[in-house]
C-alpha cells in the first residue's frame, strides 16, 4: 500500500468476508461499514452474518443491500449473468443496454435542461458511463427486501437505528443497525 506505510496504527490486509477463520481473527469493532458489496459475494446472507459478527456490543453496522424488486431483479440477474458469461455476452449486453442508457440520459438532459452527464460525476463520484458498466458487470447479484434484512439482523441482536430505502425501485436499501 502507498498510504500510511510506516504508520503503526494503520494496518492494511486483504481478506474475504466469507472466510470465517479470517473474520474471527479480526476482533470486534465499534463501527463496521460495508456499503453495497455484500450482495456481490454469491453468499449474501453469510456475508451479512459475518460482517455483523465483527460489531461489538453497542457498536454500529452500516450496510447497503440491493432492493428486491421481484421480476425486475430476476431480469437484471439474467442480464448481469449474461454480461459476465464471456465476451459474446458482454458484447451483446453492451450493444443493447449502453445505447438505451445513453438515450435515456439524453432525454433526461433535455427534459431537465441540464447536462446529466456532467452533473452525474459530481453527485456519484464516477462518470455515468463507468457507472453503467459497473452496473452491468455487478455479479454475483443478490437482493433482499427491507423486511428480510431487518428480521435477519434483529434475530442476531441488532436494532434498526436508521434506514433509507430505494422507495421500491432499483438500488440499495441503506441500513444502520446498533448491536444491543
Which residue ranges define each predicted feature?
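Conserved beta-strand signature within the Rossmann-like core of class I S-adenosyl-L-methionine
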Residues: 58-66
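Substrate-binding/catalytic lobe of Class I Rossmann-like enzymes that use SAM or dcSAM, i.e.
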Residues: 75-159
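Conserved SAM-binding loop
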Residues: 1
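A short acidic, Gly/Pro-enriched loop at the edge of an enzyme's catalytic core
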Residues: 18-32
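A short, conserved alpha-helix within the catalytic core of class I
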Residues: 41-51
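Core SAM-dependent methyltransferase catalytic element
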Residues: 156-180
Amino acid at each position: 500500500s502507498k498510504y500510511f506505510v510506516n504508520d503503526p496504527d494503520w494496518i492494511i490486509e486483504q481478506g474475504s468476508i466469507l472466510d470465517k477463520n479470517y473474520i474471527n481473527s479480526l476482533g470486534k469493532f465499534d463501527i463496521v461499514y460495508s456499503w453495497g458489496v455484500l450482495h456481490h459475494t454469491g453468499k449474501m446472507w453469510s456475508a451479512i452474518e459475518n460482517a455483523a459478527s465483527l460489531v461489538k456490543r453497542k457498536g454500529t453496522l452500516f450496510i447497503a443491500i440491493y432492493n428486491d424488486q421481484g421480476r425486475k431483479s430476476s431480469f437484471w440477474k439474467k442480464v448481469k449473468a449474461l454480461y459476465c458469461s464471456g465476451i459474446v455476452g458482454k458484447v451483446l449486453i453492451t450493444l443493447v443496454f449502453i445505447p438505451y442508457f445513453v438515450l435515456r440520459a439524453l432525454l433526461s438532459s433535455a427534459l431537465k435542461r441540464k447536462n446529466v452527464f456532467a452533473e452525474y460525476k459530481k453527485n456519484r463520484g464516477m462518470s455515468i458511463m463507468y457507472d453503467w458498466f459497473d452496473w452491468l458487470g455487478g455479479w454475483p447479484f443478490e437482493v433482499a427486501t427491507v423486511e428480510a434484512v431487518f428480521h435477519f439482523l434483529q434475530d442476531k441482536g441488532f436494532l434498526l437505528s436508521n434506514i433509507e430505502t430505494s422507495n421500491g425501485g432499483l438500488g440499495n436499501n441503506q441500513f444502520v443497525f446498533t448491536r444491543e
